[in-house]
């Protein structure tokens, strides 16, 4: 059988839709949007086997005190905010959804696992007659235990709570709910107004894309995302976003999820929210940062819960917040690259181990192994 790689397998050249394909598998180069090796990623975590660097996790970290970026380690990297921005999407509906229960408020900003409690909370936001309006993709639970769910449903999707809350908010505002996921809808305009509260009225994104759940997501630098997250601290008592996440951390993510674990460790002083493809946003109330501290982590190759966990533990640790290590490594040892924190914290960073007493030391023999000549 002959295969012609010059012809599209799905749409033949000249047919409607064929122009949507890229011109090259190498991708196009757009001025002002770095790609590939031109993206200014920095090393964040180094996995070493008996002292030799075996795997290095690259990414970007930015710290913002109020509107000021105070530390950037790859902070100029351009990315999409993805689900990390759900608290700001829901800020457009804080008045309309003010009378919801705390569980309903928490699920509205969640990227949940799809457990029974998550689905029940999301479904409670709408009457059953409104369920067909929801446009989340069909999915199965993100994490499953015991009996496996094999039939995809919209409610299992990790963003179902957000979509249900948006639909309810649109109803309360009197907005047409048809097309609520489109960038031409009032939902997106309201979201952009929230972003401009923190970045300025003249700010415009370089790109608007469709997120995995169908809602629009816009491009920001990691430093801009940190500035936006610092705003969560300033808004802490102005709406219900902060308190709902602190009250019900397991609804925000779920069992052993990084953001849920950070919310518990912070004991009310930290908001954490994961985003797809390697994002973690932290809003921290800290006496050294009266204007609010926003920190955002982006992993270059996409979501890596373990590496992001090490970075988050180190960052929170230098600020006096104790986050446990991730579950033990059974291969290499993880080491933190010091650039993830400002220089003033380097001495403290050296006191935060990336290992625990019970971790097996399986990457070496406990005697000198030499080759015989």
Where are these regions (language model features)?
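Short acidic-glycine loop/turn motifs at beta-strand connectors
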Residues: 64-68, 96, 221, 284-290
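Active-site SXXK
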Residues: 81-98, 117
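Beta-lactamase-like hydrolase cores
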Residues: 2-5, 14-78
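Penicillin-binding protein/beta-lactamase superfamily catalytic region
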Residues: 203-250, 281
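Active-site-adjacent helix/loop patches that line small-molecule binding or acyl-intermediate pockets
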Residues: 2, 14-41, 103-213, 220, ...
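Structured C-terminal helix/loop/strand segments within mature extracytoplasmic catalytic/sensor domains
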Residues: 232-373
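Short Gly/Pro-enriched turn/cap motifs at secondary-structure boundaries
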Residues: 50-53, 156, 269-273
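Short glycine-rich loop/turn motifs
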Residues: 56-61, 192, 277-280
